[in-house]
Design a protein with these regions (language model features):
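Membrane-helix cytosolic exit motif
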Residues: 253, 266-267
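Charged catalytic cores and adjacent phosphate/nucleic-acid-binding surfaces used
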Residues: 267, 276-278
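Nucleotide/pyrophosphate-binding catalytic subdomain
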Residues: 1-261, 274, 281-282
Length: 282
């Protein structure tokens, strides 16, 4: 394999890449992508290139994408007011239709970009290859769900065929209706079900910061719990850390909160000694 023709010039060092390829050879990596990575054209193109590289060097990955900002844009265009309860978007009959539309449009855009780079990908959504069955979160939230069952067999079949599934964070309820799912939670549930080696949560921040606002490159479960208890981890980072802790407690060997604003952050996280965020493990 001619790595120098596959790894971008501004990517990680080729010697380091070789070492890490062996490490992940028979493992599965789950990558959740959201935030500005999906909106900033330059970051989006680098994300597409990173996923394409993973496929070309023969590693197995699953991508779950968010789309909160795309959803907001779609709702604003249609004059629909967004309400949140405990950080979750209230999704009534009308809202869920636009949420589905925004997420499926984004999914198609990601697929088309990856296919243009000869990447072997497939779409996973309730309309096509559904793999997530949900339980409704609460009556007041409407069509918002939590994963109840993940179709592991279907996902592993795609991986066996050397495809990278691109997952829309939507699932089906027992009522046959489509429900919106928090993308971090969807990625965490899939990672647990398939015993992923790594779960990468791409964000718009550097990683987990200590009390002096300095980046922590690695923490264990106990320290993360302590930081939550002492409010060192706060705000939007709390649900992300809870997803990380849940995944690690259920078989995922390591979860990384990745700074998605860094060039080729996925490649640097997986294939360099330095990484690109905060690694959390037992």
């Amino acid at each position: 394999m001619e790595l120098d023709k596959i790894i971008p010039a501004d990517g990680p060092n080729i010697n380091e890449v070789e070492k890490y390829i062996n490490k992940y050879q028979s493992e599965v990596i789950v990558i959740k992508c959201g935030g500005s990575v999906l909106l900033d054209k330059k970051l989006f193109n680098q994300f597409i290139e990173d996923i394409s590289v993973i496929n070309k060097i023969g590693l197995s990955a699953i991508v779950v994408h968010g789309g909160g900002k795309n959803i907001k844009k779609k709702l604003d265009e249609n004059n629909i007011e967004t309400r949140f309860i405990k950080g979750l978007r209230v999704s009534d009959d009308k809202t869920i239709r636009y949420i589905e539309e925004a997420l499926l449009d984004l999914n198609l855009e990601i697929l088309n970009e990856l296919k243009s780079k000869n990447t072997n990908v497939c779409s996973i959504s309730p309309k096509e290859n559904n793999v997530i069955n949900i339980i409704p979160e609460s009556k007041e939230l409407g069509y918002v769900g939590t994963p109840k069952k993940i179709n592991k067999e279907k996902i592993l079949n795609f991986i066996k065929n050397k495809q990278i599934p691109i997952v829309v964070p939507l699932g089906l309820g027992d009522d046959g209706r489509i429900y919106n799912i928090n993308a971090d939670v969807a990625a965490g549930s899939i990672a647990k079900e398939i015993d992923a080696r790594r779960l990468l949560l791409m964000t718009d921040v550097e990683g987990v910061l200590d009390e002096n606002q300095k980046l922590i490159s690695e923490i264990n479960l106990n320290r993360a719990n302590e930081m939550l208890k002492n409010n060192i981890i706060s705000g939007g980072m709390i649900p992300k850390i809870n997803t990380c802790l849940d995944a690690i407690s259920n078989g995922v060997r390591g979860v990384v909160i990745v700074d998605g604003r860094k060039p080729h952050s996925i490649l640097f996280e997986l294939f360099s000694d330095k990484g690109a965020g905060t690694l959390i493990r037992k």
